[in-house]
Amino acid sequence: TTGRGTYVPLVFAPGEAFQFDWSEDWANIGGERAKLQVAHIKLSHSRAFLVRAYPLQTHEMLFEAHWHAFRVFGGVPGRGIYDNMKTAVDRVGRGKQRDVNARFKAMASHYVFEPEFCNPAAGWEKGQVEKNVQDARNRMWQVMPVFADLDELNQWLEDRCIALWAETPHKALPGSIADVWEAEKPTLMALPPAFDGFIEHSKRVS
């Protein structure tokens, strides 16, 4: 932040970070209008992104969204930038202090990335993905999508996202988002098997 309160753009190295956010949108699924929770995951350097739709914002949906994003991106960045969503943060403390949810922490450890949480009401800290929410509405939700089921919708969303990488100039770097992603891909960490959501609870036996 400068003295006059303007925000300096955040610059990210290849493989450094991704940003995550949820939005709500509507689709026609199996002949019925359904309100969906839409996960947006975006690589901060190349700006490659994935959008996936779910019925709820549960841990299971959150974990699946991460797995599919890392699969499509071809690996895992070093850190993830989030707001203080309830599936990730049990309690927001002072400054950057957070009580991180045990299941969320287990997922981050499994994929070996460092979670980082924005200050409350500081959406600019993950401004790329918040812009992505608006762009996705303009590009994919101008007309309500109509699909037989969520699997069909999510396959269409994945294909559309990847097509948009090639169609969209990166702007900060030469070439398209797809061009910059191809250069970023070798810097991502190898993708392990999907996280199963299981965590151990130790109990004392009297």
Where are these regions (language model features)?
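Active-site beta-loop-alpha junctions of metal-dependent nucleic acid enzymes
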Residues: 52-79
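Acidic/histidine-rich, metal-coordinating catalytic segments
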Residues: 76-96
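RNase H-like two-metal-ion nuclease catalytic core shared by retroviral integrases
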Residues: 82-83, 94-95, 113-137, 153, ...
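Two-metal-ion acidic nuclease core segments, chiefly of the RNase H-like superfamily
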Residues: 96-115
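Active-site-proximal acidic segments at structured loop/helix or strand boundaries
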Residues: 133-206
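Mobile-element integrase/transposase regions
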Residues: 2-49, 58-63, 109, 197, ...
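Basic, flexible linker segments flanking DNA-binding modules
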Residues: 1-27, 92-94, 99-100, 174-187
